Swiss-Prot record:
Cleaved signal peptide residues: none
One GO cellular component term noted in the UniProt record for this chain: glutamyl-tRNA(Gln) amidotransferase complex
Top-level taxonomy: Bacteria, Pseudomonadati, Campylobacterota, Epsilonproteobacteria, Campylobacterales
This protein's name: Glutamyl-tRNA(Gln) amidotransferase subunit A
Organism, scientific name: Sulfurimonas denitrificans (strain ATCC 33889 / DSM 1251) (Thiomicrospira denitrificans (strain ATCC 33889 / DSM 1251))
UniProt keyword Electron transport present: no
Known EC number: 6.3.5.7
Gene: gatA
Class of enzymatic activity (EC top level): ligase
Length: 447
């Protein structure tokens, strides 16, 4: 597969031929189920788009039955920026319903397979985007990351996945899960492509009140030879598998070899991250998903009266995991429990942000696992709690609003990809990409 950097240099005719060949290749591999639809419109470089990002005149459903029949009437800001830069949305990729999941098993369209082992999950919620890039069925893709939904599937599928600083990329046109945590980001074959796509989609947007007034670009200033001070977390990785620990040691040695300074640091117990994240995310999801009632748009189940129509539409339209999180969100916001749960979660969130601020007073980057294990087999995570714990290493980054990037490092004893993440201080994407490019070149991962 050609890279994004190479594709941007192709002529119009060369691109057209490439896109037709790519479409044929995708149609010849339907079992992967990475794509929901292939549109192949426009004459720009084709980019796969997660099914929760609005593309005008496309069916956009967030992987849910409740949005069947909805056609997007406008483009998300990231799509407008792509079109202006010579990129074209190519097809919509599968995802966990409303981005609530870590395996892409909860999609209305069925599960997506991991391109490295069809018995394993691709990760989630951006599993379709990760599988498409990992299988050579996309040059690059857009995903969204609420608690690791770009980085974890990128790690599982052996690609690069980047979550920008909160506010760096406009959320206008993104189907909201948890508004204070969501971010759109690039999923690519390599770090340089991620920097290029990040530059294209980032920047201030008046349509998003949380958008940052920062428009600096990184791809034309990449410097893998820059010496960086990087924190490692020896205690934090104790819950990781032996394969992940070996990959972590491999990355540390690679960073030392090229002259980066390695220092030890410590984060608070991750159990506090998980509690704060799921209380915050489900509370916000409860509000965001209240709009889906079958009246204004999407799938409607007609009941005996208006109230019954609401009940039947939401009961039949939402999947089990979405219902579970709506119930949890309503509980933590309810009278008598708001102070005990939601308020404490926000206090914990401030502590998480403060601990990162203190670490970044002395270092430029933090090296961390993305997931405790490699991709699990389908059905292996038998309880919701097991799935939630798989987000152990990613969710604190979203709670603190920081940028992070997953870079493929090695493979497990069973041949499954292992990615690690670099985390930077807020708005320091330049250092993040410089460090990631340096690590990528020294590791020289071969998918």
């Amino acid at each position: 597969m050609i890279t994004l950097k190479e594709a941007l240099k192709l002529s119009k005719d060369e691109l057209e031929n490439f896109k037709n060949d790519l479409k044929a290749k995708i149609e010849a591999n339907p079992e992967l189920n990475a794509y929901i639809d292939i549109y192949n419109i426009g004459d720009g470089v084709p980019i796969a788009i997660k099914d929760n990002i609005q593309v005008k005149d496309w069916s956009v459903t967030s992987g849910s039955n409740i949005l069947q029949g909805y056609i997007a009437p406008y483009n998300a800001t990231v799509i407008e920026k792509m079109l202006s830069a010579g990129l074209s949305p190519f097809g919509r990729t599968n995802m966990d319903e409303f981005a609530m999941g870590s395996t892409t098993e909860s999609s209305f369209y069925g599960k997506t397979l991991n391109p490295h082992n069809k018995d394993c999950v691709p990760g989630g919620s951006s599993g379709g985007s990760a599988a498409a890039v990992g299988a050579g069925l996309a040059i690059a893709a857009l995903g969204s990351d609420t608690g690791g939904s770009i980085r974890q599937p990128a790690s599982f599928c052996g690609i690069v996945g980047m979550k920008p600083t909160y506010g760096r990329v406009s959320r206008y046109g993104l189907g909201a899960y948890a508004s204070s945590l969501d971010q759109i980001g690039p999923m690519t074959q390599n770090v340089e492509d991620a920097a290029i796509l990040y530059d294209i989609i980032s920047g201030h947007d008046e349509k998003d009140s949380t958008s940052a007034h920062k428009n600096d670009k990184v791809s034309d200033k990449l410097n893998p030879n820059r010496k960086i001070r990087i924190a490692v977390l020896p205690k934090h990785i104790q819950n990781a598998s032996e394969d992940v620990k070996k990959a972590y040691e491999l990355a540390i040695n690679a960073l030392k070899k090229v002259g980066h300074e390695i220092v030890e640091a410590e984060l608070m117990d991750a159990k506090f991250d998980i509690s704060a994240y799921y209380i915050t995310a489900t509370a916000e999801a409860t509000t965001n998903l209240a709009r889906y009632d079958g009246i204004r748009y999407g799938n409607r189940v007609v009941g005996k009266d208006l109230n019954d129509t609401f009940v039947q539409t939401r009961s039949q339209g939402f999947g089990d995991e979405v219902k579970r999180r709506i119930l949890l969100g309503n509980f933590v916001l309810s009278s008598g429990y708001y102070e005990a749960y939601y308020v404490k979660a926000q206090k914990t969130r401030h502590l998480i942000k403060d601990q990162y601020s203190k670490i970044f007073e002395n270092v430029d980057l933090i090296l961390s696992p993305v997931a405790p294990t490699t991709a699990n087999k389908f059905g292996e995570l038998s309880t919701p709690m097991e799935m939630y714990l798989s987000d152990l290493y990613t969710i604190s980054v979203n709670l603190a609003g920081l940028p992070a990037i997953s870079v493929p490092i090695s493979k497990s004893s069973e041949g499954m990809p292992i990615g690690l993440q670099l985390i930077a201080n807020a708005y320091d994407e330049q250092t993040l990409f410089d460090g990631a490019l340096s690590l990528e070149r020294e590791i020289n991962y071969n998918a």
